[in-house]
Regions:
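Acidic, surface-exposed loops and disordered segments
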Residues: 1-152
Length: 152
């Protein structure tokens, strides 16, 4: 489906068919696609919990403002923002992997690590929460578009 059609037709699903559970392999593929989402300095600060256990979803219900789709969906994804993703060890790991994948040379790698560390260094808790909300929101949109493109 063309991107424009995906964007024009995207809707927030409120009702789920109990006779159409999502296969775990297909769900994992959608998560993998969403993991390619853009993020600030490629920090990739999202962590995903997949809840299929009805008892766990029942416990989550009050935190989700009683939305019945927490119970009726075949799986619930809990999207968490990892504050440690904006710290030097993760930034170094990410850019080292990009270097190993031959995305750029060592000089660019070193520059990107230094620039990212300097960018996040002055972040207070509010800045960190805003960054996580933005980056995790990009992941969520990528996931929704991938799911829509797959017919969900």
């Amino acid at each position: 489906m063309p991107l424009n059609d995906l964007l024009q037709n995207r809707r927030s699903t409120r009702r789920f068919r109990p006779d159409a559970p999502i296969d775990r392999a297909e769900l994992n593929a959608l998560i993998s696609q969403a993991n390619r989402a853009s993020s600030s300095n490629n920090a990739q600060p999202w962590r995903i919990m997949v809840l299929t256990d009805p008892a766990l979803r029942q416990r989550l219900l009050p935190e989700a403002y009683g939305q019945e789709q927490i119970i009726t969906a075949s799986a619930v994804l809990v999207l968490l923002g990892d504050r440690a993703a904006y710290r030097e060890p993760n930034l170094r790991r990410i850019h080292q992997q990009e270097f190993a994948d031959d995305c750029f040379d060592a000089n660019v790698r070193d520059f990107l690590i230094q620039a990212a560390v300097q960018f996040y260094q002055p972040f207070d808790e509010t800045d960190t929460q805003r960054g996580l909300a933005l980056d995790c929101g990009l992941w969520a949109m990528a996931f929704m578009l991938a799911a829509e493109a797959a017919g969900w």
